[in-house]
Amino acid sequence: MLDPNLLRNELDAVAEKLARRGFTLDVEKIRQQEERRKVLQVETESLQAERNSRSKSIGAAKARGEDIEPLRQEVNQLGEKLEAAKAELDKLQADIRDYALTLPNLPHDSVPNGKDDSENVEVFRWGEPKTYDFELKDHVTLGELTDGLDFPSAVKITGSRFVVMKGQIARLHRAIAQFMLNLHTEQHGYQEMYVPYLVNHATLYGTGQLPKFSGDLFHTKPLEEESESQYALIPTAEVPVTNMVRDVILEEDELPLRMTAHTPCFRSEAGSYGRDTRGLIRMHQFDKVELVQIVHPEKSMDALEELTGHAEKVLQLLNLPYRKVVLCTGDMGFGARKTYDLEVWVPAQNTYREISSCSNCWDFQARRMQARFRAKGDKKTQLVHTLNGSGLAVGRTLVAIMENYQTADGRIEIPEVLRPYMNGLEYIG
C-alpha cells in the first residue's frame, strides 16, 4: 500500500511513476475524494465542538432554573448531523482505502522502463550450457524412462497440472529441498519456519494478494463476504512468513530478520491457459523454499542483493547455468519496488526459464501489515522494509537437474552436493 501522504502531497509524481508501470492513476478522482475528505473532517470536528459546547450549556441553564428543552433538542439535532457527517466520512475513507489497495508499488529509479518480459535486462550470466553428442530428452521423457514422474495418475486423482512423483525421483525432489534449507540455515543465517498452508484473508491483504488477485488463489469457500472460517491455500510461503511481523513493533536491534520455509504452493494459474501444458514447469501445486527478510529501511537495497545472492548460491553449488535479469516496470509483481529473476538453463527447451524471483517490496507490505520497528532512543515507530525470494522453486530445480545431468542412455546423474541426501546414489535409472 502506498503512503497516503504521497497521494495527498505528491500526487502528480506518483501518477508519473505508476505510468512507468503502465498503470493509469485516476488523479481527478483522488483529488475530489481528498477535497471532500477535508470538508467532512472540518465539518465533523466543528459539529463535535459545537455539540460539546451546547451540552455544557444544558447544565448551566438547569442550575439557573431555565427551561432546558430547547437546548436539549438543539443538542440532539447536532448529534444527528454529527452522526450523518461521520457516516459519510467513514464511507469516504473506506472508499479511499479500497482504491489505494488496488494501486501497485512505485518502481525504484534503477528499474528499467518496459512493457513486458521482452524488455527485462540481463545483468549477469553464470556457467556455460553443456553440449551433448546425443539427442536430448526433456524431463517428462526422462521421468517416464526412470518411472519417476506419473502425470496420468495425477490427472485421475485430481486433474491437469498435477503430478505424482515416485521412487528415486521423489527422493531427489525431497533431497533438493533439504539441501536448500540446510544451505540457507547453516550458511546464510536464516531461521527455518514451519507455517500453515491455509491462511486467512487478513494475511492475504497484508502481503498484497487481496483484494486484486483473488482469482489466482484456491479458496476453501467462495469469496463472498469475509469471515473467520474462510481461508485460502498459500500461493507462496512469502504470505505466512512475512505476516509473522503483522501488527508487531520490533526493536531496531532485532533487525534484520531472515526466515526460510519449505512449503507446497498452490496457484490457479488463471490466464495461463495453453502455456507450459507439458511437464513440471507450470503446476497448480509445487514446492518452493522461500526466503524472507525484514530489514531496516536504509538497508533494503543491499538486502536485495544479498538475498538474490543466496538464491544464486544454490544454482552455483548445483552447477546449473543461469542468468540474472532485472525486471522492467511492465513485468514486475504488484507489490515489488525492484525484482531480480534468476533463469536456469533448460536444455530441452534451449532457453533459460525462471527459477527464482527476488523482490524488494520496500514499505508496501509493511504499511498494509502495520509491521514496524522502533529506533534506539526514539519513541516513534517506523515501517520496516520487506523482501522475499525463491531459494529456489523445487520442481523447476528438479527439471533443470534432470535435463542438465541426463546421460545418453536416459539416466540422470545426481549432482555431487546432493549425493549425501541420496545415500551416496550417483545415478537414477
Curated annotation (Swiss-Prot):
It catalyses: tRNA(Ser) + L-serine + ATP = L-seryl-tRNA(Ser) + AMP + diphosphate + H(+); tRNA(Sec) + L-serine + ATP = L-seryl-tRNA(Sec) + AMP + diphosphate + H(+). GO terms for molecular function: ATP binding; serine-tRNA ligase activity. Pathway: Aminoacyl-tRNA biosynthesis; selenocysteinyl-tRNA(Sec) biosynthesis; L-seryl-tRNA(Sec) from L-serine and tRNA(Sec): step 1/1. InterPro entries: aa-tRNA-synt_IIb, aa-tRNA-synth_II, aa-tRNA-synth_II/BPL/LPL, Ser-tRNA-ligase_type_1, Ser-tRNA-synth_1_N, SerRS_1_N_sf, SerRS_core, tRNA-bd_arm. L-serine binds at residues 236-238, 290, 390. Its EC number is 6.1.1.11. GO terms for cellular component: cytoplasm. It is an enzyme of class 6 (ligase). CDD domains: SerRS_core (cd00770). GO terms for biological process: selenocysteine biosynthetic process; seryl-tRNA aminoacylation. Keywords: Aminoacyl-tRNA synthetase, ATP-binding, Cytoplasm, Ligase, Nucleotide-binding, Protein biosynthesis. Its main location: cytoplasm. Residues 45-65 are annotated as: Disordered. Catalyzes the attachment of serine to tRNA(Ser). Is also able to aminoacylate tRNA(Sec) with serine, to form the misacylated tRNA L-seryl-tRNA(Sec), which will be further converted into selenocysteinyl-tRNA(Sec). Homodimer. The tRNA molecule binds across the dimer. Consists of two distinct domains, a catalytic core and a N-terminal extension that is involved in tRNA binding. Belongs to the class-II aminoacyl-tRNA synthetase family. Type-1 seryl-tRNA synthetase subfamily. This is Serine--tRNA ligase. It comes from Proteus mirabilis (strain HI4320). The lineage of its organism: Bacteria, Pseudomonadati, Pseudomonadota, Gammaproteobacteria, Enterobacterales.
